[in-house]
Amino acid sequence: MKTLLLTLVVVTIVCLDLGYTLKCNKLVPLFYKTCPAGKNLCYKMFMVSNLTVPVKRGCIDVCPKNSALVKYVCCNTDRCN
């Protein structure tokens, strides 16, 4: 009985992600990556001249400020970029 209980506890720990990890889209949204510790935001970078096509996506720790040439959109849920 103790062995069964221990097995269930181990399976639960393995199945549950005890340390939450954020998943962000790569440039092609069909693919994503798991962000490393400390990178708690997903971002999407656009050139101001063409705001419909993102040029870069990924994980980041702090959302960069927009500039005259580049716009950033940041979010904090899985695959939100």
Swiss-Prot record:
Keywords: Cardiotoxin, Cytolysis, Disulfide bond, Hemolysis, Membrane, Secreted, Signal, Target cell membrane, Target membrane, Toxin. This is Cytotoxin 2. It comes from Naja atra (Chinese cobra). Monomer in solution; Homodimer and oligomer in the presence of negatively charged lipids forming a pore with a size ranging between 20 and 30 Angstroms. The lineage of its organism: Eukaryota, Metazoa, Chordata, Craniata, Vertebrata. One of its GO terms (cellular component) is other organism cell membrane. Basic protein that binds to cell membrane and depolarizes cardiomyocytes. It also shows lytic activities, but 2-fold less important than that of CTX-A4. It binds to the integrin alpha-V/beta-3 (ITGAV/ITGB3) with a moderate affinity. It may interact with sulfatides in the cell membrane which induces pore formation and cell internalization and is responsible for cytotoxicity in cardiomyocytes. It may also target the mitochondrial membrane and induce mitochondrial swelling and fragmentation. Pfam families: Toxin_cobra-type. Disulfide bonds join C24-C42, C35-C59, C63-C74, C75-C80. It comes from the Eukaryota. Its main location: secreted.
